[in-house]
Curated annotation (Swiss-Prot):
Entry protein name: 4-hydroxy-3-methylbut-2-enyl diphosphate reductase
InterPro entries recorded: LytB/IspH (IPR003451)
Domain of life: Bacteria
Gene3D superfamilies, per database record: 3.40.50.11270, 4-hydroxy-3-methylbut-2-enyl diphosphate reductase, catalytic domain
Binding residues for (2E)-4-hydroxy-3-methylbut-2-enyl diphosphate: 41, 74, 124, 168, 226-228, 270
Length: 316
């Protein structure tokens, strides 16, 4: 059996930054450090940070007064930001800058009284945060749609003053269809020059297309609550290949590879490389050859840490 590695795969700049913020806060201020929601959607990463002293909570009312709290990479609503400020909590915001860009767009539309439509998955923390950035006090409204059927059923108050934004981790193909449906139904709708799907999501989906075209089975390393990891698995399946989402090597099942010549391996944007290496090792234990890595788009994007953490680290 051959192992073929997708490129790029794994951590993106926003995930790197979010994990670094938690680690540096733990180094600079000592545990406990509170984190609202999983800082990134990966069990291995969250368990590691928990062992180091991070305490993950669902809401701010679980955070004691005079504590440090970190907002996850997925972003939060204005109400959460205001609650933290009102309580005087020390906040480090690990929201991915590409999610913040969408928040800025939504805030601008609300200020102008333009109604907004968010394309995204209901219940996802990023969607909850983005929806909560829209201030309805100017008379506008924000709507959520997930697919073309939602667009068909949608009624808005002001179709002449309407804009759309997207969750950053969606399927590129599915999102294009939803945007087409929106433009057909609401010809005057505004939108970003390019959809809000992030560079890492785009690159990893392109890499999986290449991978699936060459392999019999595709393994996606990622947690089941990771949106971008699920989209990678779905994309490989749409290309007619068996595809499996696994958190780690222990979830592999040897019968998946009966009669298989080429196994493709990739990882979602929140999955660390160590998990990929463990999956490769397990496959080699079962007789696979050393992996070959495909050529792919080079990523050199980095996002800076909050100034106080940079200063603290420099002083240390």
């Amino acid at each position: 059996m051959e192992i073929v590695l997708a490129n790029p795969r794994g951590f993106c700049a926003g995930v790197d930054r979010a994990i670094a913020i938690v680690n540096r806060a733990l180094e600079c201020f000592n545990p406990p450090i509170y984190v609202r929601h999983e800082v990134v959607h990966n069990k291995f990463v969250v368990d590691d940070l928990r062992q180091r002293g991070a305490i993950f909570v669902d809401e701010l009312d679980q955070v004691p007064d005079d504590s440090i709290v970190i907002f996850s990479a997925h972003g939060v609503s204005k109400a959460v930001q205001q609650e933290a400020e009102h309580r005087g909590l020390k906040v480090f915001d690990a929201t991915c800058p590409l999610v913040t860009k969408v928040h800025i767009e939504v805030t601008k539309y609300a200020r102008e009284g333009t109604e907004a439509i968010l394309i995204g998955h209901e219940g996802h923390p990023e969607v909850e945060g983005t929806m909560g950035q829209y201030d309805k006090s100017k008379g506008g409204h924000i709507y959520l749609v997930e697919d073309e059927a939602d667009v068909e059923a949608l009624a808005v108050n002001h179709p002449e003053k309407l804009a759309f934004v997207t969750q950053t981790t969606l399927s590129i193909d599915d999102t294009a269809k939803v945007i087409d449906a929106l433009r057909t139904k609401f010809p005057q709708i505004q939108g970003p020059r390019k959809d809000d799907i992030c560079y890492a999501t785009q690159n990893r989906q392109d890499a999986v297309r290449d991978l699936a075209s060459r392999c019999d089975v595709v393994l996606v390393v990622g947690s089941p609550n990771s949106s971008n990891s699920n989209r990678l698995r779905e994309l490989a399946e749409r290309m007619g290949k068996a595809a499996y989402l696994v958190d780690n090597a222990d979830q592999l099942e040897q019968q998946w590879f009966d009669g298989v010549a080429k196994i493709g391996v990739t990882a979602g944007a929140s999955a660390p490389e160590i998990l990929i290496k463990q999956v490769i090792q397990r496959l080699q234990d079962w007789g696979a050859e050393a992996p070959k890595e495909l050529d792919g788009r080079e990523e050199n994007i980095t996002f800076s840490l909050p100034k106080e953490l940079r200063i603290q680290v420099t002083q240390a």
